[in-house]
Every structure is written in structure tokens, then in C-alpha cells.
């Protein structure tokens, strides 16, 4: 049968595709076929929003053009017939003009690495196309499907607030917490209230937007016909009528129906499932209809969830409240269901038929008694969605030929009450741990139960109803006895085995009770409002807040920084909030990342083949099936390596595993083929047989088996025995700190291009470490380093994850290019990246602290254990830094810290922002908080009492000079109004039984330098051209931290020329050799001094010409020097002086200086669910004399939010066999827009120049991250209040809270009558779903 032509529009241009393949996504088509690289691949599963585009079509049922955002990574091109696609390139560019959305995110400093920026731009653009004057709430909701790992979200929201009709300036009324008039303080120096000037923004003019393609508009009344698209393996049929659809289903009962592809697309990509026949019913009117009937509202099964949501919102606004109880429950679930990109395309019917056991909506539909209409050729039936509808895992009552035609969501009746609940790891766009729909119907005029439905997701392999429990409650009164009986019944009926998939067994069981208790209280409250209190009892006022749905105030933020001195030249940009130099290009999609480089004509694609066993011998590798895949070129392995297969920082790694694998994800080989799709299929065809060996997975396993790398590391000072003997109190404890995935938005990527002579090869790499990439590739190929050129334009984030681990990809790709003689490209998929490349080290610490009754610490002993993985990588240096930071900011006269590196069968863990420091400091604050509790003293008082003073020696004997921490502490106490708010928190906790607040203030001291002395060096190369323009190169790489921008500012001041004359193109090994990695927060310090040195050389050469022509211009002096045959090219070099520490003698300076900061955070926890919200954070940070306040504040906020993820949200789950469960944004949750503090206030400490760094600045990348521990300990403070109330224990009780403080840990720590009903016994031989590594 002949395939049809696919016709759609992209940015106004008509596209006619004669060979549309149903397996091709819009993202792949845009990037590879149309060359539109602005739309990015971040995850491939619709979870990050980097691929967001706007789709527009004429909706025949609504009779209007509709615009909606969508994830291009999931949208099959075959679904786009007669659709207009708008990408970031289509709304504006630097060559023409930026769209106001692009301009505002750039100028408000909302783009750092820039990889997420195009997707965020398109989410905002789509919102404005539908709502030119949105509310701030609508703006925040528009980004529920977008993630950013760099900025901390604040500048994005602040920039886009200028579009809001309820945002921006308050007109001087002072009624806005962000009022600019409130920000100007009476200081001796001028503080700036704004990082950008909104009045300079281009106004939004909706009339100037591109029009919908007239050709598509003319087709709106043309009858649709069935379409057929044939791919390599899959056929796609677009049915145009219901009859066609039913006939197709009868002919092909196994065909999959696809509307949004948000489920099937995931199964095809990540579960390797193949569906040869796909039928799309999206055009069929009956499946898209919305009908208001006498019993409820019916939605066609293909209705997008966004239509369901809008319809129900309208109904709730118009109908009596009593009639819309169910609607409000559905809306509460849809509120957190997913991002706009998913809700705009995912269908309500697809959500039901997918039959997910953790569905957000199915428990609600089941509890409401929703009716489903099922049809097949010749039959039609209506069934109620009850406990029989899902007979098993991912199964429904539908026969193979049947389809779901519609769902009727019922109106609620008089005396009927309904609630819906969901608890996930993250509030926004997250898969539920437990969901529930609950309904009760009372006999008229009474509180006697006539019907009760309690339905749950996440408590079995399907959506279930607690029938035994509910049947027992019929005819009972809505009173305490019923509550107790239901809770006892649920605990018994919904019991989970200890090895249940998904884990968190006690938490999930407790949630079933907590949800019912909330429902019970909500109904009690409503009955009271209806004057039925006498029949059911009165709601305790302290319980009332437990019934409140989550609400968040509009974001409020303050940024304070010291303005440049009066008289500073307008051209001197040092100290000014200059936007990131690439921000405009990033916002328009023009910035080029590694995978954006146009494909070479003869380019090949590579896919890694990795181990599925944690520890095993390789018995055989069979590539016969891989070779059958079209486009297959070769398989490479250790046997193909021409040089050395030994690699890694410590020479304990291999490029490819040869005889044995030592972790799941260990690279065994790679498949090379003509396209990424073919390489993926071929890689799946490689069959490996293993002989399994015993594996060590956890820190406890390593300790038990004495599995360590190297000897014990130790720092010791004072007389520990004497210190403990003199202490009034001694407390011992243990804390575990989980690992963290880097989750840079751009995964690892390398393009290797063989040059065809003398072994030369050019590599384009997303790496922080050009030198190691060069040397590792050269060693593997057996050629000198001078034959390998490594080039880095920019990275889409790094955070330490691309310091060493990028080489595991680069070496494999280089070998493939060497073997084939052709360019080879590899960009890891998100799941591969997370599986292979490691992350932050998990730590286990055992501590013992001695202290006086006054709170003064006199002795400390801490044993640190880190889970290193299967190779050492940078782990020793990371442990060393943890030991250097085990004091945080506190003077401890007698101290001993030890560190052991646990050798395990996990992928090697590596550098991550903070580099061991955050782990060491969290442990310190853990025992410090316990000192305060034991002494019965305010925590802030104990912390202040133990702080170092100017001139003190640390435990590693480095003298503290320029110790600004006390100033940061006092400023933060004052600006946060700590003491007044502490009283308010205490008052709130007395008045609220089931919600508690906590407040905490935390300091940080972070050492600046590589602790390996020889790395503290940098080079720069500066070319001045005869037109006066300057090309600058330095050894640092740009990953969003603004390093290139700062270096241009440094050069601009040094040369006394505008920044517009200076350009940085890239970082490469053939311009600046032997570079240190861009890491340790020192890149601006090191490279800034090298740039300065190069500038001084040029200035010295130009000096004679300036003297000859003092009134001349820069160009005049440059031309004169050139004519006089003077070199206009110079190198610069810098090394940090006086560094070098000895562990043997505990002497020498490991650091050049320290950065300091203090944060105060307030949180509110829901004791029943473990949910929490971050109410407010105040930060005071010492960054010296800021080179660029906008970039520095962005680093403070971004680091803080990344720390917020580390300490409260991000959790890696490994199976007992060492396989990572959490391999993408659907299972691993980084902070989202809604995760940040509602009030976020950042102040840079004024008048604190740092004489040890370029232009008196300070490092800023890593130091602020630990300040997020203020949220962790505020949560612990709130839990303490809950435990004191519900257990009757003394507030001096010590309890353990490991990091991260997830909802599970918070809820389980809030011990109460519900948790005691849900304690699961774990049999000795039970193998849990996940283990703590």
C-alpha cells in the first residue's frame, strides 16, 4: 500500500515529507533533517522541557486556532499532519531581533549554561500566545514541565514577572515584598536594588506574532481522509472516522492507539518495545467531544487533559459547590499531574487504559464511580469504573477489539463529599508514591454513612479499592470510632510486602492512613459548616490546617550588591551586572553546543555497550544480531585499542572491560552505525554472557569485607582523650548522606574527526578538562599528545561531572574514528549518562562529640566512609576536602577525623560541586545541632559561641585571615529578622497540630584552591588584530558559570577598552596547553590572573606608542605597533603561591583563602504526608569585590538550589544487585520551579575586598551550596516540634535524620498514632527493592 505524504509547517515554512517514519520524533527531524538545533535533547522522556516547541492547529470542534506547548522528544512526526510547529528559531534571532521573551530571559540573567533556555523560552512564548497578560500564577504553572540545573530559577521568574499583569513594580505603594523602594538600605556604600532595568525591555506586541499558515486555515472545512505512513519497522494509520477506527481495531487487535505518545513513546525508547501497527484516533470527533449531561460531564477518550482541566475549571466556577466535589478532586490531581507540554497532548483515555498502578487519576475516577463507554465493531457497552475494571498489572476489562470511547465524570450529590490526594518526591511533575480518591455519601440530613469509597494507587500492582474496610463502615456515624476502625482496617488490608516494587513500604502504608485522616477532617469541617456538628463532633481548631490544600504565595525576591565606586569609567565593566555574553544566542537557540555542530557528510554514530552485572567474568560477546541491523558498521572493544587500554586518573580503569566487569554500566564495547537509531538497535543486539562474582554494593558491605582503596586518611590535633574526659557531655551518633546525580541538561557528547595524516585527530567535546581528554585519547591511540586537538565551545552544565568522566566517552569515540577513518559522534542518552558516569559520593559518618554545659565544643572524633565505586578517580582528594571541612566554621581544640574510601561494585563516583566539602560540613552541623539540643540552648547561640575568630588556626593549622564570617552572621540574623520570626514559628507550632514550621541559620567556610598544588596554574593567549579587536583564549571552559564573561571583563579593565572589542571563541588544547580542569571554584582566580598577565605584556609593548600619541585611540596604538613590527600576541601565566599541605605533619596551607556565607531558612512540613515547602531563605555571601554581581548572585542561587536538591529531594535508588533504578527525570527528581523558597533574598557582603584574587574578588561556584543545609536543619527543627507533640518526648530527644530529607524520611520521623500502625517487619532473607549504597 502506498504511503501518504506528511505535510506540516515549521516556522512558517511548508515541509512535505514523502518517507515519514513513525519512529522518528519531531526533535530528531528538526535537528537532523531541518538543521534546527535550537530545540535540545535533555532527557528523551518528556521530563525536562529542553525540547519544548509550540504546536498550532485549527481545532474543528472549538472552531478556532489553538496553540499549545509540546515535548518534541516524544512527538512522532506522523502526528503532525496539518500542524504548524514553532521552534525557538522561529520567534526571533540576534540577526534580526530578539522576541521580548528571549530578550527578557537574557537581560534578567535567566540563562547560565543555556541548554534549558530555548525550552523555557518556548513555554513562556506559548503562554503569551494564549494569554498576553498572564497572572504570576499562570507564569509559574507554564514551567511545570521545564527544568533548569544552573540558575535556581529565581532570575527566570523575575524576568518573566515583567509580563504579568499582577507583577512588576507596585507603583511605590510598598505593598509588594519585592518593592524596589524597600530594598535601598542606609549604608555607607551604595547598594543596588536591581540586576536589570525592566524599563529598557521591548514591549510585547501580540499583533506582531507570526500568523497561522493560511494554507492550513483553508483546509479547516475540507473532509479528512485516512492517512498511512510506513516506516522501517512501524506502520502508522491516522483514522478519520470512528467506523474506520473500529474496523482497524478489528483487523489489528494488537495495534496500539496513540494520541500524545507520552506512554507508548517511553515504552518504545526505554523498554525497547516494538509496536508494528500504531493507530492514531486524534482526529475522530466522537473521541474529542465534551458533553454536559444530566449526571455529569462526558469527555471523549482522546480529549487532551488540558481540555479536561479547562472544562472542569469552568464547571467549578459556574455550578454550585455541592455539585462539583468530584470535579475539584480531579482538578487537584491535574494540578500536579505533569507539565503543560504533557497535559496538552496526553489524552484522558490513554491515562485510563495505560492502567498504571500509580496513576494519579484512576483512583479518583474509580472512587467517583465514573462511567466508561466501550465500543467495538458492532458492540457498545457502558461500565462503571470500579474495583473490577483493572484485573491485573497494566490490564483492563477491554477486549482486544474494544476501545474506550468516553468517560463520564459524575456530578456530586447532596450529602456527598469527595477528596483526592497524591504524595510524590517532588510536588511538580512527579510520579506518585501513593494516590487516592475518597468519597463518602451520607444518608439525607445525617452523618450516617450510606456509601464510602477509598481507592488507591501505589498500593498494589493495579488501582485498588479498600472494599473490606469500607463495607464495615456502612451505617456508621462519621465519628472518632469510624476513624479508628478505618485506619486499623487500611493498615491490615493495604499491607505491602517488604520487597514491594518501589520500596518505601512503611511510608506508603502510612500515607493511606494519613490521606484518610485528612479526608475525615475535611468532611468533619464541611459538616460543621452545614450545622451538623452535634451529630459528628467539632473539629479541633489545631487540626484545621491539615485540611488545607497546598497553596503558595507569589515568589518574592531581593538581591543586594555593592554598586561600583563613583567615578568608575562607564567602559569599565568590572563590578557591574553584565549579562552573560552568550545569553542572547542561548535565548534564541543560536548558541552552538557539541551536538549542534553540523553533521559531517560521512559521519557515523556510536552507542556504548555496557555491563548488566555488577561483578562478573565476561564469558562471551556475540555481535551476530547487531550485524543484521541496517547501517551497522562495526563493533569495537579492547581488542581494537592500538595504544593502551589502561586509563583513568589513577591508571586503574580501562577504556573497555576485557575479561571482567566491576559494575553495572561498565563499558564493554561500542557499536558504530550510520544513525543513532540504528546504533541503539544494534547495541541491543549485542549479547554478552557472564559468570557472576560476589559483589560489594554498599558502604556497610565494604566495611564488613574490609574493601577499601589505600590507607586511612587522618587529620588530628590536640589531645582527644583529655578533651573527652573534661567534657560535661559526650554524644555519639551516625549520619548517612546520599549521593547525587549531576543532571547537567546536556549529557556527555563527543565528536571525533580523524585528519587522515600522522595520527592527527580533532575532538569536539563537552568537557571541563581538555588536557586529560587530550592525554587519555593520545595514550589510548598510542600517539603523542601533539596529534590530538580537543576543542570546547561551551557545555550545557558540568558541576564536576565532566571533569574526568567525560573521557570514558571521548576515548571510545576516538577509537571508533580511528578504526573507521570517519567522523564519529556520540551523545549519551540521559539513562546511559546516569548509569555510566557516577555522581556525588555517598558518605557514612560516625561521630563522637564532647562539650561543656555552656555549649562549647571541646572534643570531636569523626570517622568518614565514602562509597567510591569501582575506580578511585578523584575520590582521595574528595575525602581530603571532607576532612578539611569537618569543622565547618567551628573552633575545636581536640579533634580527629579519619577517612576511608570504600571500594564497591558501583560506577565510579566523581567530582561534584563542593567536592566532599558539603558532606563534611553537614556532618559537622548534625553534631552541632545535637550539642544545642542536649544543652537545651538555642541552636544559633551554640553555633555563634563556637565560631572561629580572626587569626585562629583551623584543625589543619591554617591561619584564618580576613575572616568575614561574623559579619555575614550578624547581617543574616538582622536581615532575616531571625529572633522575631523564631517567636512566630513557636506560635505557629502551638496553634497547628499536623503542620509544623522550622527555622535555622547555618554558616559555611569553604577553602579555595585545588588541594593538589600543581593544578593551581593557568595560562592565557591574547591576540590583538589590526582593527583593534581582541581574541582572547584561556585555559578555562565555559559551562554556564560565566567564566568567559568575567574574563572579558578582566581583559577590558586591564586593556582599558570596551568589552565589545574582546571575543572568546572557544577553549582548545592547541591555543593554551596543559590546562587544569575548570573546577574547584578557582577558574576565575587562576585564569583571571593569567589573562591579566597577558594584557600587561601587550600594554607594555604598546606603551611607547601611547606616549608618542597620547590623544590617539586604541586602534591608533595597535596600528602603530603593527607597522613597527611589534608582536600583538601574548601569553599569560599564573600559579597560586604558597600552597602545599602535609597530612603526615598536619602543616602547610591547602588553601589560598576561604569564602564565607550564612543562610537562614524557614520551612513548613506536613506531618501527615512528609511534604514540605520552603517559605523563605536569606543569604549573606562574601564574594569579595564582585567581578560581576549578576553572575555571582546567579551562582549563589544556583548552588543553593542544587544543595536544596542534595539535602531534601534528590535520591538515587540502587537494586541489591547494584543496578541503578533512577535513570531519568521521571524517577530522579531535581528541584523544579516550585521547589525554591517562596521568598528568596540574597545579599553580597559589602566592603570586603580579597587581596588574594583578581581585582579583589572571591570564588563563588561551590561555597554557597552547603547553605542549603539551613533547609535540612529547619526541617529537622520542625520534625522535632512534631515529635514533641505526638510522642510526648522531651524536646531534648535526639533522633536521626539522614540526608536527603525526603517526604518519606520526614513522614517516618514524625512518629504518631498512624506510623505505629504501619511498621513492616523485614524477614532476614528478604531482598528489598532498593538498598542504601
From Swiss-Prot:
Its cofactor is [2Fe-2S] cluster; FAD; Mo-molybdopterin. Disulfide bonds join 509-1318, 536-993. One of its GO terms (cellular component) is sarcoplasmic reticulum. Can be converted from the dehydrogenase form (D) to the oxidase form (O) irreversibly by proteolysis or reversibly through the oxidation of sulfhydryl groups. It is found in: Cytoplasm; Peroxisome; Secreted. GO terms for molecular function: 2 iron, 2 sulfur cluster binding; FAD binding; flavin adenine dinucleotide binding; hypoxanthine dehydrogenase activity; hypoxanthine oxidase activity; iron ion binding; molybdopterin cofactor binding; protein homodimerization activity. It is linked to Xanthinuria 1: A disorder characterized by excretion of very large amounts of xanthine in the urine and a tendency to form xanthine stones. Uric acid is strikingly diminished in serum and urine. XAN1 is due to isolated xanthine dehydrogenase deficiency. Patients can metabolize allopurinol. This is Xanthine dehydrogenase/oxidase. It comes from Homo sapiens (Human). The gene is XDH.
Amino acid at each position: 500500500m502506498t504511503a501518504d505524504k506528511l505535510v506540516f509547517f515549521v516556522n512558517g515554512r511548508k515541509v512535505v515529507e514523502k518517507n515519514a517514519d513513525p519512529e522518528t520524533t519531531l526533535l530528531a527531524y528538526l535537528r537532523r533533517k531541518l538543521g534546527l538545533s535550537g530545540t535540545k535533547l535533555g532527557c528523551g522522556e518528556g521530563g525536562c522541557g529542553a525540547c519544548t516547541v509550540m504546536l498550532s492547529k485549527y481545532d474543528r470542534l472549538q472552531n478556532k486556532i489553538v496553540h499549545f506547548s509540546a515535548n518534541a522528544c516524544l512527538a512522532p512526526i506522523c502526528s503532525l499532519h496539518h500542524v504548524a510547529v514553532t521552534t525557538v528559531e522561529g520567534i526571533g534571532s540576534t540577526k534580526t531581533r530578539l522576541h521580548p521573551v528571549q530578550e527578557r530571559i537574557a537581560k534578567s540573567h535567566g540563562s547560565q549554561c543555556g541548554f534549558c533556555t530555548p525550552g523555557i523560552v518556548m513555554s513562556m512564548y506559548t503562554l503569551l500566545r494564549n494569554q498576553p497578560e498572564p497572572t504570576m500564577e499562570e507564569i509559574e504553572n507554564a514551567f511545570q514541565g521545564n527544568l533548569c540545573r544552573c540558575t535556581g530559577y529565581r532570575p527566570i521568574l523575575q524576568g518573566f514577572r515583567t509580563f504579568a499583569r499582577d507583577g512588576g513594580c507596585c507603583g511605590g505603594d510598598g505593598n509588594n515584598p519585592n518593592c524596589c523602594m524597600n530594598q535601598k538600605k542606609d549604608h555607607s556604600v551604595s547598594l543596588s536594588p536591581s540586576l536589570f532595568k525592566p524599563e529598557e525591555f521591548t514591549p510585547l506586541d501580540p499583533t506582531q506574532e507570526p500568523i497561522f499558515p493560511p494554507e492550513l486555515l483553508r483546509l479547516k472545512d475540507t473532509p479528512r481522509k485516512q492517512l498511512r505512513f510506513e516506516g522501517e519497522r512501524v506502520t502508522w494509520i491516522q483514522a478519520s472516522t470512528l467506523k474506520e477506527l473500529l474496523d482497524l481495531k478489528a483487523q489489528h487487535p494488537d495495534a496500539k492507539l496513540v494520541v500524545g505518545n507520552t506512554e507508548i513513546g517511553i515504552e518504545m525508547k526505554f523498554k525497547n518495545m516494538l509496536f508494528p501497527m500504531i493507530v492514531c484516533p486524534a482526529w475522530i470527533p466522537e473521541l474529542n467531544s465534551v458533553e454536559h449531561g444530566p449526571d455529569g460531564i462526558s469527555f471523549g477518550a482522546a480529549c487532551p487533559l488540558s481540555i479536561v482541566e479547562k472544562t472542569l475549571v469552568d464547571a467549578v466556577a459556574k455550578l454550585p459547590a455541592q455539585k462539583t466535589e468530584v470535579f475539584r478532586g480531579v482538578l487537584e490531581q491535574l494540578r500536579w499531574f505533569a507539565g503543560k507540554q504533557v497535559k496538552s497532548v496526553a489524552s484522558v483515555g490513554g491515562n485510563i487504559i495505560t492502567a498504571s498502578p500509580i496513576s494519579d487519576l484512576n483512583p479518583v475516577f474509580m472512587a467517583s464511580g465514573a462511567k466508561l463507554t466501550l465500543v467495538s465493531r458492532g458492540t457498545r457497552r457502558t461500565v462503571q469504573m470500579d474495583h473490577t475494571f483493572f484485573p491485573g498489572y497494566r490490564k483492563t476489562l477491554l477486549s482486544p477489539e474494544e476501545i474506550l470511547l468516553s468517560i463520564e465524570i459524575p456530578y456530586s450529590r447532596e450529602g456527598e463529599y469527595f477528596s483526592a490526594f497524591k504524595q510524590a518526591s517532588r510536588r511538580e511533575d512527579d510520579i506518585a508514591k501513593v494516590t487516592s480518591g475518597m468519597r463518602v455519601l451520607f444518608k439525607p440530613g445525617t452523618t450516617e454513612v450510606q456509601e464510602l469509597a477509598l481507592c488507591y494507587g501505589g498500593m498494589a500492582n493495579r488501582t485498588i479499592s479498600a472494599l473490606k474496610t469500607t463495607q464495615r463502615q456502612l451505617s456508621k456515624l462519621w465519628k472518632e470510632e469510624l476513624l479508628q476502625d478505618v485506619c486499623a482496617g487500611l493498615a491490615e488490608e493495604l499491607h505491602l510486602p517488604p520487597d514491594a516494587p518501589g520500596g518505601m513500604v512503611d511510608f506508603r502504608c502510612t500515607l493511606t492512613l494519613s490521606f484518610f485522616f485528612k479526608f475525615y477532617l475535611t468532611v468533619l469541617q464541611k459538616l460543621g459548616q452545614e450545622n451538623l456538628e452535634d451529630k459528628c463532633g467539632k473539629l479541633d481548631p489545631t487540626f484545621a490546617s491539615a485540611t488545607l490544600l497546598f497553596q503558595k504565595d507569589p515568589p518574592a525576591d531581593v538581591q543586594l550588591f555593592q554598586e561600583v565606586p563613583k567615578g568608575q569609567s562607564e567602559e569599565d565593566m568590572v563590578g557591574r551586572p553584565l549579562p552573560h555574553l552568550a545569553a542572547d544566542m542561548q535565548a534564541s537557540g543560536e548558541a552552538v553546543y557539541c551536538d549542534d555542530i553540523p553533521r559531517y557528510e560521512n559521519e557515523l554514530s556510536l552507542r556504548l555497550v555496557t555491563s548488566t552485572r555488577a561483578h562478573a567474568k565476561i564469558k562471551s560477546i556475540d555481535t551476530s544480531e547487531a550485524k543484521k541491523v541496517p547501517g551497522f558498521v562495526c563493533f569495537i572493544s579492547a581488542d581494537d585499542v592500538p595504544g593502551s587500554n589502561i586509563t583513568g586518573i589513577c591508571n586503574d580503569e580501562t577504556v573497555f572491560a576485557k575479561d571482567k566487569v566491576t559494575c553495572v554500566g561498565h563499558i564493554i564495547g561500542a557499536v558504530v552505525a550510520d544513525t543513532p537509531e540504528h546504533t541503539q538497535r544494534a547495541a541491543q543486539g549485542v549479547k554478552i554472557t557472564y559468570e557472576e562474582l560476589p559483589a560489594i554494593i554498599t558502604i556497610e558491605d565494604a566495611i564488613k569485607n574490609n574493601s577499601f582503596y589505600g590507607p586511612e586518611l587522618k587529620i588530628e590535633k590536640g589531645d582527644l582523650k583529655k578533651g573527652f574526659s573534661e567534657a560535661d557531655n559526650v554524644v555519639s551518633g551516625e549520619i548517612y548522606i546520599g549521593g547525587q546525580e549531576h543532571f547537567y541538561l546536556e549529557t556527555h557528547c563527543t565528536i571525533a574527526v580523524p585528519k587522515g595524516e600522522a595520527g592527527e585527530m580533532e575532538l569536539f567535546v563537552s568537557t571541563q578538562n581538555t588536557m586529560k581528554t587530550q592525554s587519555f585519547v593520545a595514550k589510548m591511540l598510542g600517539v603523542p599528545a601533539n596529534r590530538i586537538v580537543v576543542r570546547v565551545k561551551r557545555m550545557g552544565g558540568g558541576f564536576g561531572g565532566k571533569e574526568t568522566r567525560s573521557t570514558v566517552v571521548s576515548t571510545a569515540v576516538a577509537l571508533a574514528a580511528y578504526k573507521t577513518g570517519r567522523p564519529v559522534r556520540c551523545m549519551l542518552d540521559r539513562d546511559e549518562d546516569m548509569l555510566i558516569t557516577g555522581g556525588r559520593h555517598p558518605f557514612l559518618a560516625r561521630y563522637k562529640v564532647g562539650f561543656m554545659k555552656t555549649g562549647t565544643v571541646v572534643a570531636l572524633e569523626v570517622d568518614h566512609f565514602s562509597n567510591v565505586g569501582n575506580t578511585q578517580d578523584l575520590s582521595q582528594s574528595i575525602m581530603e576536602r571532607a576532612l578539611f571541612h569537618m569543622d565547618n566554621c567551628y573552633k575545636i581544640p581536640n579533634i580527629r577525623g579519619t577517612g576511608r574510601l570504600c571500594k564497591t561494585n558501583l560506577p565510579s563516583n566523581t567530582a561534584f560541586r563542593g567536592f566532599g566539602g558539603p558532606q563534611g560540613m553537614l556532618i559537622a552541623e548534625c553534631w552541632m545541632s545535637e550539642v544545642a539540643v542536649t544543652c537545651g540552648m538555642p541552636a544559633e547561640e551554640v553555633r555563634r559561641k563556637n565560631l572561629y575568630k580572626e587569626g585562629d588556626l583551623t584543625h589543619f593549622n591554617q591561619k584564618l585571615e580576613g575572616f568575614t564570617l561574623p559579619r555575614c552572621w550578624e547581617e543574616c540574623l538582622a536581615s532575616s529578622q531571625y529572633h522575631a520570626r523564631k517567636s512566630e514559628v513557636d506560635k505557629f507550632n502551638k496553634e497547628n497540630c499536623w503542620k509544623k514550621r522550622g527555622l535555622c541559620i547555618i554558616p559555611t567556610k569553604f577553602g579555595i584552591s585545588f588541594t593538589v598544588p600543581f593544578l593551581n596554574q593557568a595560562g592565557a593567549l591574547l591576540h590583538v588584530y589590526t582593527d583593534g579587536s581582541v581574541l582572547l583564549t584561556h585555559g578555562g571552559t565555559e559551562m554556564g558559570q560565566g567564566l568567559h564573561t568575567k574574563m572579558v571583563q578582566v581583559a577590558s579593565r586591564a586593556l582599558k577598552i570596551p568589552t565589545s572589542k574582546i571575543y572568546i571563541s572557544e577553549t582548545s588544547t592547541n591555543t593554551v596547553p596543559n590546562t587544569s580542569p575548570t573546577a574547584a571554584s578557582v577558574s576565575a582566580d587562576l585564569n583571571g590572573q593569567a589573562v591579566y598577565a597577558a594584557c600587561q605584556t601587550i600594554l607594555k609593548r604598546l606603551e611607547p606608542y601611547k606616549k608618542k600619541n597620547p590623544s590617539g585611540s586604541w586602534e591608533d596604538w595597535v596600528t602603530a605597533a603593527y607597522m613597527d613590527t611589534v608582536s600583538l600576541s601574548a601569553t599569560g601565566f599564573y600559579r597560586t603561591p604558597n600552597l602545599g599541605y602535609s597530612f603526615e605533619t598536619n602543616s602547610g596551607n591547602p588553601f589560598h583563602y576561604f569564602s564565607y556565607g550564612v543562610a537562614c531558612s524557614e520551612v513548613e512540613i506536613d506531618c501527615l504526608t512528609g511534604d514540605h515547602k520552603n517559605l523563605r531563605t536569606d543569604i549573606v555571601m562574601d564574594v569579595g569585590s564582585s567581578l560581576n554581581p549578576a553572575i555571582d548572585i546567579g551562582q549563589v542561587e544556583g548552588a543553593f538550589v542544587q544543595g536544596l536538591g542534595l539535602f531534601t529531594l534528590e535520591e538515587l535508588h540502587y537494586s541489591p544487585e547494584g543496578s541503578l533504578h533512577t535513570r531519568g527525570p521521571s524517577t530522579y527528581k531535581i528541584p523544579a520551579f516550585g521547589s525554591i523558597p517562596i521568598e528568596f533574598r540574597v545579599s553580597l557582603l559589602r566592603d570586603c575586598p580579597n587581596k588574594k584574587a583578581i581585582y579583589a574578588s572571591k570564588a563563588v561556584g561551590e561555597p554557597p551550596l552547603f547553605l542549603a543545609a539551613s533547609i535540612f536543619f529547619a526541617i529537622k527543627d520542625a520534625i522535632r516540634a512534631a515529635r514533641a507533640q505526638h510522642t510526648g518526648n522531651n524536646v531534648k530527644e535526639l533522633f536521626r535524620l539522614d540526608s536527603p530529607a525526603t517526604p518519606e524520611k520526614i513522614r517516618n520521623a514524625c512518629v504518631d498514632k498512624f506510623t505505629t500502625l504501619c511498621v513492616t517487619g523485614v524477614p532476614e532473607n528478604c531482598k528489598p527493592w532498593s538498598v542504601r549504597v
